[in-house]
Design a protein with these regions (language model features):
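N-terminal presequence-like segments and the immediate start of the first folded domain
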Residues: 1-66, 70-83, 89-136
Length: 136
C-alpha cells in the first residue's frame, strides 16, 4: 500500500494585494491529503458551556481558537493543519481585536480566511464563531 504524504502549498499570487499578510493567504493547495477534518462552528464556551470573555472580542476569539485546537487534537491534527477558516462576528468594527488574538495562534502556517458580520449568533452573549477545515 502506498503511503501518501500531504503536500500543502500556501500562497499569494502576484497582482493581488494581501493587506493582512499576518493572518491569511489567498490560496492553499493540498495535494494528496491523507485526511480532511471539517470543524463545526466553534464558540467562546468552556467545557461546561459557559461563555468565556463575555463582552470581550479578543478573549472570545482566543477561546474559539483554543476550542478549535481541542477539536483538532481529538481528531489527530493541530492548528497548523487548518487550511481554511470562516469567521462570523457580530461586530466587524472590532476587527483589530480579532486579528490580535489570531496572531497569537497562527504564526507561520496561515489559513485562507473569510470574515462575515452577522446580526446574531446562537446566544446573545457570543460575539464570534469560527468554522474551519484542516488537511493532514
Amino acid at each position: 500500500m502506498e503511503n501518501r504524504m500531504s503536500k500543502i502549498i500556501r500562497g499569494d499570487p502576484p497582482g493581488l494585494t494581501n493587506v493582512r499578510k499576518s493572518i491569511y493567504h489567498h490560496y492553499i493547495r493540498v495535494d494528496n491529503p491523507k485526511s480532511l477534518i471539517f470543524l463545526s462552528g466553534q464558540l467562546s464556551r468552556d467545557a461546561f458551556g459557559n461563555i468565556v470573555g463575555k463582552g470581550d472580542m479578543k478573549e472570545q476569539t482566543k477561546q474559539c481558537i483554543q476550542n478549535m485546537q481541542t477539536v483538532l487534537e481529538a481528531a489527530g491534527g493541530s492548528l497548523d493543519d487548518i487550511v481554511s477558516i470562516v469567521v462570523y462576528t457580530t461586530d466587524i468594527r472590532q476587527f483589530k481585536e480579532i486579528v490580535a488574538a489570531r496572531e497569537e495562534f497562527f504564526i507561520n502556517k496561515l489559513p485562507t480566511s473569510t470574515i462575515v458580520e452577522v446580526n446574531h449568533l446562537a446566544d446573545p452573549g457570543l460575539l464570534i464563531e469560527f468554522q474551519a477545515t484542516a488537511a493532514l
